[in-house]
């Protein structure tokens, strides 16, 4: 297997690169929720503060065109991985302090920004390093290792945090500090590995365009989009993109606190170990199977036929959570 410019096998760097891409995303959006809840924040505080952490991924298209103005994509990938590793260590160091909340929020924001930039650079590097045929061939591998990162954090690490809390007699901060020390070590290891094994494509060069030229191109792109489709169609497209996964987005953060809160506080009262198994392992397997089935149906009959059934399918979990909120059924098999 060869790339466009190098003889180095994509198997040497694609799995680890996309595992590294998935880790910080789920650490910031999922692991932080569980940690803050266990450290005493209310549901309202958890929802407010962790909700803001997703902002860098929302607005990353605004700075993605400017990445090539400074250094290469490979440089950005390695630099962001090093910064993420340092920020994870910063979270671990700051957890035992009196200002742990302010410090960890700053580090989580840094991780979110670095992760969004890493996504841009890693995807760009993938496209310039591999020819179109090889890109298509490795799409499945990319997605697999990205999902494995989600399983690792949502499944294994949450369960490990629960086990550590039992071993260290409910020392919650110390247990979470150990988790983040471990994550910092993993990311520093990934950074060192990629420094050695990521190829150096000849096409990965710093652009000679200026900031003004890139900003002008970005402005023209938005203008062309609105002129081509018209204001009415553009508004409809934007509303569709906003609302299609809106029910899922509403559930994303608060389901974690709902599952972990005790029955006396309106939750299901699962332990971190049970949560990790139910949500991070079994739930993700269901997500993968659903994605495969949806892909088969769409490829066979087209998106037009299955669009509204899929809209209903993505809203179905809301009904399940309504049932669980009324019944407060803590049976792990039911959950």
Report residues per predicted region.
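C-terminal ends and interior cores of transmembrane alpha-helices
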Residues: 78-99, 312-333
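Helix-loop boundary and gating motifs at the non-cytosolic
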Residues: 2-57, 233-265, 276
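Intracellular loop-helix junctions on the cytosolic face of multi-pass helical membrane proteins
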Residues: 1-8, 41, 92-95, 99-103, ...
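Helix-to-coil boundary motifs at intracellular loop junctions of multi-pass secondary transporters
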Residues: 35-39, 69-70, 125-130, 258-268, ...
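Transmembrane alpha-helical cores of Major Facilitator Superfamily
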Residues: 19, 50-55, 82, 109, ...
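Helix-to-loop junctions at the C-terminal end of transmembrane segments
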Residues: 58-72, 289-308
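Hydrophobic core of transmembrane alpha-helices in multi-pass small-molecule transporters
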Residues: 19, 87, 99-118, 330-335
């Amino acid at each position: 297997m060869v790339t466009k410019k190098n003889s180095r096998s994509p198997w040497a760097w694609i799995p680890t690169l996309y595992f590294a891409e998935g880790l910080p995303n789920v650490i910031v959006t999922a692991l932080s929720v569980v940690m803050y809840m266990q450290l005493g924040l209310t549901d309202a505080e958890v929802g407010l503060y962790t909700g803001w952490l997703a902002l860098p991924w929302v607005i990353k298209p605004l700075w993605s065109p400017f990445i090539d103005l400074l250094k290469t994509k490979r440089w950005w990938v390695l630099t962001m991985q090093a910064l993420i590793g340092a920020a994870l260590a910063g979270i671990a160091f700051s957890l035992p302090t009196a200002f742990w909340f302010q410090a960890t929020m700053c580090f989580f924001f840094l991780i979110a920004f670095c992760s969004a930039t890493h996504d841009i650079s890693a995807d760009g590097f993938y496209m310039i390093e591999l020819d179109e045929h090889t890109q298509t061939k490795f799409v499945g591998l990319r997605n697999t290792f990205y999902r494995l990162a989600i399983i690792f954090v949502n499944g294994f690490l949450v369960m490990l945090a629960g086990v550590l809390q039992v071993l260290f007699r409910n020392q919650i901060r110390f247990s979470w500090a150990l988790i983040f020390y471990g994550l910092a070590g993993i990311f520093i290891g990934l950074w060192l590995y990629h420094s050695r094994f990521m190829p150096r494509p000849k096409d990965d060069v710093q652009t000679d365009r200026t900031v003004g030229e890139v900003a002008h191109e970005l402005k023209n792109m938005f203008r062309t989009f609105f002129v081509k489709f018209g204001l009415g169609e553009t508004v409809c497209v934007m509303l569709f993109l906003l609302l299609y996964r809106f029910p899922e987005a509403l559930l994303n953060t608060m389901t974690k606190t709902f599952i972990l809160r005790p029955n006396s506080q309106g939750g299901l009262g699962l332990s971190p170990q049970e949560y990790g198994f139910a949500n991070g392992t079994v739930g993700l397997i269901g997500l993968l199977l659903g994605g495969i089935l949806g892909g088969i149906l769409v490829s066979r009959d087209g998106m037009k036929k299955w669009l509204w059934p899929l809209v209903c399918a993505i809203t179905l979990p809301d009904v399940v959570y309504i049932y669980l909120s009324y019944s407060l059924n803590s049976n792990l098999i039911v959950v």
